[in-house]
Every structure is written in structure tokens, then in C-alpha cells.
Amino acid sequence: KEKFMLGVYVMIKDKTLYDLQNLVRKLVSDKNSIDDVRSFLLQLIFCFYCEESGIFLGKPFTQLVLNSEASSFPSRFMQLIASLPPFMAKPQQLFLSDDTHHAMKKLCRISWNDVNPSIMGAVHQAALSRSDQRATGTHYTSLRNVHRVIDKLLIDKLLDQFSETKSAEEIAVLYEQLGKISVFDPACGGGNFLIESYLGLSAMRLIASRGISSVKPLSTRNFHGLELSEEAACICRTALFATARLEEKRYAEQFKTPLSPVDLSECGDIRCIDALNFDWDKISADYIVGNPPFMFNHKEQSFSQTQLFADSASASVDYSAGWIIKAAQYCAAHPRTCLLYTSPSPRDGATS
């Protein structure tokens, strides 16, 4: 429990979200299970995003938090979220003390429009036990390290191209180009790499849209992910959906256009599947990014790696080496660019 509370704090690293850490501490003190606390936090965060992006009109969740009693909140909350996607509507046996309910009210003061939706992946990751992390090779990638990859691979190059663009015609071409770029994370987890790539491209596209008559927000359909965990894949889809909806609201406000109806398909192309047994050529992408799972000498890796390394004596290297080989094969067959955040060597145990 202490690890979960610390994990949420360390992964968020945002002083404005101290109140969220405080709520976690109180929920755990109320003897709620870690799984129930995690599910509730994800639902709570998603509800705030729904209010910020216009999915919930009239801020019904905020009104529920502010106007309900601690004893009645759990049942009324379940009624509110019944219409959400199935993963977000998961019921919990939640107990709230008056003190915990008061701590929740403080979250209503936060401007969630300014909070990165990758926080959802951080909450999910923080709740995983050490044994779960070892079993799946799952490791949280900080936003700093995410940008070490995507800035070098994608963003910096596009910024250079943007700075060299002079005429209105060239800017219009760049605007169209930014809308067609596709990004692929074959070990996407909660979606940090895809979310940050989307936000970077969307920000540049918003700047390039000046002078263009018909402007549309960036679609998530060109953001592809593979993930073995169904729960992590659901979180990735949900976070991408929230990200896209917040960006759509930003576009609507800047260009003074009506906010379009909710499109539930705007949640990326995220597939729950074993990436090493999947044919990557079924996905058309310009850039490959990510942090492959690391679990050296793990028994479950044998089948995938035995097939992948059938022509070599490399089956004893770490699971993450499979992603490196698959990425190399993928790039060799097509003109694509790849940068993965992995261990210093596929035989080492720490990432860098």
C-alpha cells in the first residue's frame, strides 16, 4: 500500500496534484483494496476529463462530489458511470469516510484540462505489485524518458522542418503532412508514448493551421499500439480518447466552432495481442517508438522467442530483444524510422 501511494506521487510529479496523492492515502486508510482504489481513481479522473471536454454537460460529477454525503456517494457514483465504457463502469465495494470525501472535494478545484491524460497509465502502473511487474516485464516510462525518444525521432525533426517553412503554400502542405503521420508502439502499456506523440503533433498542426479555412483536430486513428494486458490496453484507449477530446475542445475554442458530437472510435488503434507473435506488417506506420518489456530468463518468453530466433542461438537473451529484432525486420522491409527505450544491453537488467 505504501508503494502504491508513493508510486502515484512519484509518477505524477505535479504539485497541483498533491490532493490526488492525499486522496489515495485516505482511501487506503479506509481499508479499501488496492484494486478498488485504482479502479476508482481511474473512473474519477476520467469523469473529470468528461466534464472538461464537454462529454458530461453541467458537471454532474463535480455536483455529485460536492453535494452528496460520504455514505451515499458510492451508490450514486455507480449510477452516474453506468453509461461509460465497460472498463470505466467497473463497480467497486468502496467505503468513504467523511474525511476521505472531503479530500475528494478538493480535486474539483483542479483544472483537469491542464492535466496530461497519461496520469491514467501512471495510476495503473503504480498499483501493480512487484511480482506482477516482474511477470509481465512492465516498467513505467517517465514523460522525460518518453521525450528522450520521441523528440529525437520525430518532434525535433518536424520543428526544424517547420522553421524552414516560409510560404502559405508550404505551411498548408506541412499541415496536411502532420495529419497523416502514423506512430506505432508495439508495447504500448498505458499509452505514454502514443499520447505524447499525439500531443506534440497536434500542437504543431494547430500552429500550422493558421490561414487554413477548414481545420480539423488530429485523429487518433494513426496511432497504433500492441499490448498483451487487456486492462492496460483499455487504459491506453481511454487515455487516448480523453486526450483527443480535450484537443478537440481546444480547437473548437480557438476557432470558435461548435464542439462536435462524441466519437467513441477516437481511441487509437490499440490491439490486445502478443506483439512477438503478431505480424507487424499489418500495421502501416511511419515511426516506431516504445519501451519493450524486460524480463530476462522468464519462462513464458520461450515460445515467442524460440520462433523469433529460430535461425540463431539468441533465444537466451532478454524478452525485450524480441522487439528489437521485430523492429529491425519491420524497418528493413519498409522505409520507416524506429527508436526504442531499452536496457543498455538485452542481457542487462536496468533500462537507460
Model-predicted segments: where are they?
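Non-catalytic, well-ordered alpha-helical scaffold segments
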Residues: 18, 35-43, 75-78, 101, ...
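Extended, well-ordered alpha-helical scaffold/bundle regions in very large, multi-domain proteins
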Residues: 54-79, 190
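SAM-dependent methyltransferase catalytic region
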Residues: 132-343, 347
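Short helix-capping/linker segments at secondary-structure and domain boundaries
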Residues: 50-62, 133, 160
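Ala/Thr-enriched low-complexity intrinsically disordered regions
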Residues: 350-351
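Generic structural signal for hydrophobic core residues of well-folded globular domains
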Residues: 27, 44, 48-53, 68, ...
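Short, basic/polar, glycine-containing "phosphate-handling" surface segments that engage DNA
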Residues: 1-50, 54, 91-121, 130
